[in-house]
Amino acid sequence: MAETVWAVFPPMLTIVLALATKEVYMSLLIGIFSGAMLYTDFNVLQTILTMFAVMEEKVGKNVNILVFLVILGIIVAAITRSGATAAYGSWAAKHIKGKRSSLLLTALLGLVIFIDDYFNCLTVGTVMRPITDKFKVSGAKLAYIIDATAAPVCILAPVSSWAAAVGSSLPEGSTIDGFGLFLQTIPINLYAILAMVFMVFIAWTGRDFGAMAAVVREERTSSAADEYSGDDDVKESKKVGKGTIADLMLPIFVLIAACVFGMLYTGGIMEGKGIADAFADCDSSKSLVLGSFIAFVFMALLYLPRRVISFNHFCECFGIGFKAMVPAIFILCLAWTMSGIVSDKYLNLGGYVGGIVNANASLGIFLPAIFFVVAMFLAFATGTSWGTFGILIPIAVAVVGVENYQGLVLAVASILSGAVAGDHASPISDTTILASAGAQCNHIEHVNTQLPYVLLVAACSFVGYIVDGITQNGWAGLGAGLICMAAVCAVIYTKLPVVEKDDK
């Protein structure tokens, strides 16, 4: 049943079950099992073997990400246990005035950390959660801000791991300059641009709607946000030390600097490559492990000699940090397995979707809009934007042709935009999972609350890509998308009440 309509069934079953039952683990397991059943023609024994073979392959390829998560969990636990987080929260309560300021500062930090989406999600959550907790900001709202400044920011940054992913998705032997093509897609990556515009609007005005408004109202009336919103495992990491703000900021600064250094190092900066080429060729997951380990060693040397925290309490952070990351690790492993089941090696969902795109190539002026919708669906169903790049960009090159370079730029931009939109909405996406982990928010609650926002921004982006196709001018599409977004924001501002009040 490979490369047929049945390839759509497992991810869609997973998503429907997750949204209906709010049980993401079981939903993923059922979806993976159904996909393996389809692949093995309902041979139960082969289904089980296939499931674990795919899991072994996918988790093995991503083990560096898991190590990074564990080390980061330990760092967060140690920072909290040292008392540095409490000191930072006290400082924030005096200097940051209200929810609006805390959310805008979260957004600003997300814009600054553009090198990698995984790193962005967890670092922004670690730094900003003490502040947003002080002002009783809903965990779902924080997760939305984190998610909206992860992939959408990275896909617009020339110096990021995402630029490399786009270049590597071009057909083998292509004469196209991948990095140059990526640079030209930046101003017409409509979803990424509009998502950040809308996110700032929501943070500034406090006007929420849909599931997000319901969650914010519930937390305001029940005072559920009076307590720290994290998991019990994170709560175990109580303050026992005498840390200061510097004991939080210095490890985070070293973490950022070390990860940037890791990307340059693994990309070949020491071999004479330029900065842009080094970022393009880096091994981002290995870089994150290297950077997090350097930050961990630095933190130990910063804390222990000064007796900010005792050696025994520091060692306790190993178990606490690991336990805090177990839910995210488990979901990631299952999500990677699901993406493996629908990969070209098994059910080949990408091949099926690619066939649909090729069959509609004659629609001409609507190609950017078609690529946007198809990329969004594919990323939503598989949970991977990079995989979507790899499937659809070669198809765009074949359909549009290198000779129509402006048309190719529009097509690739719409693919990148749609992939980020689908990734942003998908409950089985890595970045969605990590945004939930960074905000210590229930994962399905995060998916439910941000989905209406994603769809609204995607609709404005779709309008922009229709204009792009008609005019063959990316700036015209950007203008149309911004006008559409401005109209939506005006309606929300005039018709909806303030839900997230800016309490001082």
PLM feature segments, named:
Residues 10-20, 31-38, 68-77, 107-113, ...:
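Hydrophobic core segments of alpha-helical transmembrane domains in multi-pass membrane transport
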Residues 44-143, 308-403:
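Membrane-embedded alpha-helical segments and adjacent helix-loop junctions characteristic
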Residues 93-179, 381-421, 431-445, 485, ...:
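Hydrophobic transmembrane alpha-helices that form the pore/transport pathway of multi-pass ion
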Residues 134-135, 326-330, 334-346, 361-389, ...:
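C-terminal transmembrane helix pair
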Residues 182, 195-281, 293, 297-317, ...:
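Long, contiguous bundles of hydrophobic transmembrane helices that form the permeation core
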